[in-house]
Amino acid sequence: MVLSAADKGHVKGIWGKVGGHAGEYAAEGLERTFHSFPTTKTYFPHFDLSHGSAQIQAHGKKIADALGQAVEHIDDLPGTLSKLSDLHAHKLRVDPVNFKLLSHCLLVTFAAHLGDAFTPEVHASLDKFLAAVSTVLTSKYR
């Protein structure tokens, strides 16, 4: 998936608006994923999956940090996410569809919190960005 210059600008702009809430929003998106798609819980049998648990918050921060790195290095997603791709493909063996499910729930969460800043153009660009991140994260599965 090729991100246009406009897409990259929208992603960087909205990530700037997310700011210090990135970990909180990512944790909410993760929790939303667990509720909307219960099969995703199978990868977290050791987690306390209750609302706002410390483990969900901590994993949300990891997700947010990885996305922040991806935004910062938007022109080199494969290089930026290579180690994370290895981890998910070879050690964790996460079903690739779960990245799409999480991406969807992250979009819903961002839309709920960002209001008018989450324009249709931003939505489309962020969707393309998350799809590109998902593609990179699943690239080592082949």
From Swiss-Prot:
Red blood cells. O2 binds at residue 59. One of its GO terms (biological process) is hydrogen peroxide catabolic process. The modification Phosphothreonine is found at residues 109, 135, 138. The modification N6-succinyllysine is found at residues 8, 12, 17, 41. SUPFAM superfamilies: Globin-like. The modification Phosphotyrosine is found at residue 25. The modification Phosphoserine is found at residues 4, 36, 50, 103, 125, 139. Keywords: Acetylation, Heme, Iron, Metal-binding, Oxygen transport, Phosphoprotein, Transport. The modification N6-acetyllysine is found at residue 17. The keyword Mitochondrion does not apply. GO terms for molecular function: haptoglobin binding; heme binding; iron ion binding; organic acid binding; oxygen binding; oxygen carrier activity; peroxidase activity. Residues 2-142 form the Globin domain. Involved in oxygen transport from the lung to the various peripheral tissues. Heterotetramer of two alpha chains and two beta chains. This is Hemoglobin subunit alpha. It comes from Notamacropus eugenii (Tammar wallaby).
